[in-house]
Amino acid sequence: VAPKDWRLLRLDFSCCSRINLEACKNLYKAALDERIPFKAESLSDFAENRPDILKTVPAFYNIQISAEDASVADYTPAFLKCTGGMENMGLEKFRALLSQIAEFSETAVVGLSARGEPLKVNSLCDYIESVLSFPGLSVLVETDGTLVTETLADKILVALKNAPARAVKKSAVTWIVMLDAFSEEKYSSMRHGGNFAAAVNAVQILGRRFPSCVYPQFTRVNENEDELEKFYTFWHETDSPSGGKLIVKKYDSCCAVLPDRKPADLSPLERCPCWHLRRDMIVLCDGSVPLCQECIGEEPAGNVFEEGVQSVWNKIELSSDGTSVSKKDKCGKCDEYYTFNF
């Protein structure tokens, strides 16, 4: 057994991506300066507390193309979103943002669902097609499923087939359908304004066209814990509409702004550097960038349409202990630091 376990850091000293290349370059220079032996154990130990190695370029951009919702989950009240009245992100602005992302990160996952229902925009297919025009980018759509139709799914499938091959071994289009329940009764108590039958049907529609790329999602809270086993048992079967794919997501209290409703504490015994500060960037409809997903209604780190992606990203500083330089008090209340997106 190794004396120390670095697996939680997911260190990768290869140069197969921009995010790893920059980490390796920074590690090499710093190790030379500090006279660190060029051995895996020594380099891992050294890299563990180096912000310039742990945080290089974003791997996941979660973009708010729509500030509207189709339904509202019981565990994320709409008032927390603080984007009421904001206009949707226009397609031309979105495409300009993608160009910056592709240049800065080279390879990344682009989410379309930050604080809003992406299917509320006109022609979601055009947004997805724009992402897929960059070989290094793939797209994630998280939806409540109520607006998914056969026609829309067919159009997106055509866009996928016409897109250039991906530069990385990652699904070009991934779908998450928020269900949060196994029964219609429980669903109705969890999601206000939703439609259980339509959401389940969305998994079927998408699963037939995007096999192994559709994930029904269950956000685990005290109120639906009694249906977790049935949800898992059904959707985990390979003959289910999702082909056995599913996500059980932890509840987020938004740094204790919301009540603690999680049935179990899954946080590690020792705190690790925050994955979201290291790898994620959220961009709202107006181009403003929250410091992290937990910063709701606070002063943004910057605006990508005014300052550029790289400039704003560099403002989000990571300390040597893996927390935010400017928001240490908030980080101390947060238990999302160990959850990993891409």
Regions found by a protein language model. Give the residues of each.
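Short, acidic, Ser/Thr-enriched surface-loop or helix-capping motifs
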Residues: 283-284
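Conserved core of the sugar-phosphate nucleotidyltransferase
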Residues: 1-14, 22
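C-terminal accessory region of radical SAM enzymes
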Residues: 36-52, 202, 209-213, 237-265, ...
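Short, small/polar residue-rich loop motifs at catalytic or cofactor-binding pockets
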Residues: 274-278
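Canonical Radical SAM [4Fe-4S] cluster-binding loop centered on the CxxxCxxC motif
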Residues: 60-93, 104, 292-296
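Radical SAM/AdoMet-radical enzyme domain recognition
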Residues: 91-113, 121-235, 242-246
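A short acidic, helix-capping loop that chelates divalent metal ions and anchors anionic groups
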Residues: 7-9, 82-84, 183-190, 257-258
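Hydrophobic helical membrane-anchoring modules
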Residues: 14, 20-56
